[in-house]
């Protein structure tokens, strides 16, 4: 799901606490947005590829901008 879809689902209350985890295929962090929706739960770029954040604080910043108050981080 991309940023626009994330914002809409957040406003509708359809998202759980986001989970940030270390990217499986190298350096960086990915965001999983589970909830009551049928979209791909991984945060994506506008072109549909999985968005990999180089820095953890960048991922957290985007989620705070959407409006999340709580974020879970796992390794």
Give short role names for the model-derived ranges.
Residues 1, 25-29, 63:
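Short low-complexity stretches enriched in small and charged residues
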């Amino acid at each position: 799901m991309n940023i626009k879809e994330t914002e809409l689902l957040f406003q509708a209350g359809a998202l759980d606490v986001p989970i940030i985890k270390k990217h499986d295929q190298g350096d960086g962090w990915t965001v999983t947005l589970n909830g009551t929706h049928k979209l791909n739960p991984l945060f994506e770029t506008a072109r549909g590829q999985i968005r990999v954040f180089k820095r953890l604080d960048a991922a957290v910043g985007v989620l705070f901008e959407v409006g999340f108050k709580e974020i879970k981080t796992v390794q």
